């Protein structure tokens, strides 16, 4: 197994419902270590740049509106095969299709308000971590 870093974002719906601690518990119980974490409000510009790969998709504007509707918690996670492990503990994008015991099944409200975003590949993880964090903010 390989030690990896991955990016995670707790979304506004979970923040508004005071679920940060619960989300972190899922992540830590899965064996992931939170090595950086900060809360902020994303600007529309930041959100549009972050989700740039979806710019041509019909849901892009609503995604930017949603992700800027409240605070988010940005995280760097570390662990063995962290990217796959994080994707597994998050569950399917649609909470209705996610397995029981996953963050999205247990805490998500809809496809958009599904409580959490996580990197889907090593390239995405690198880009997303570097988008929000300086190396000095990541505690080993």
Swiss-Prot record:
Gene3D superfamilies: Nucleoside diphosphate kinase-like domain. Its cofactor is Mg(2+). It holds the Pfam family NDK. GO terms for cellular component: cytoplasm. It catalyses: a 2'-deoxyribonucleoside 5'-diphosphate + ATP = a 2'-deoxyribonucleoside 5'-triphosphate + ADP; a ribonucleoside 5'-diphosphate + ATP = a ribonucleoside 5'-triphosphate + ADP. Its main location: cytoplasm. The keyword Transport does not apply. Belongs to the NDK family. PANTHER family: NUCLEOSIDE DIPHOSPHATE KINASE, NUCLEOSIDE DIPHOSPHATE KINASE DDB_G0292928-RELATED. Major role in the synthesis of nucleoside triphosphates other than ATP. The ATP gamma phosphate is transferred to the NDP beta phosphate via a ping-pong mechanism, using a phosphorylated active-site intermediate. This is Nucleoside diphosphate kinase. It comes from Rickettsia rickettsii (strain Sheila Smith).
């Amino acid at each position: 197994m390989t030690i990896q870093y991955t990016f995670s974002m707790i979304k506004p719906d979970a923040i508004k419902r005071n679920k940060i601690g619960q989300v972190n518990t899922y992540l830590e119980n899965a064996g992931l270590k939170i090595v950086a974490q900060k809360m902020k409000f994303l600007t529309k510009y930041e959100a549009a740049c972050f989700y740039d790969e979806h710019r041509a998709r019909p849901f892009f504007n609503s995604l930017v509106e949603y992700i800027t509707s409240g605070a988010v918690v940005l995280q760097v996670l570390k662990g063995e095969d962290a990217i796959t492990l994080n994707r597994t503990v998050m569950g399917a994008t649609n909470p209705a299709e996610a397995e029981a015991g996953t963050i999205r099944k247990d805490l998500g409200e809809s496809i958009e308000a599904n409580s959490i975003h996580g990197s889907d590949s090593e390239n995405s993880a690198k880009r997303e971590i570097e988008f929000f964090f300086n190396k000095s903010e990541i505690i080993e």
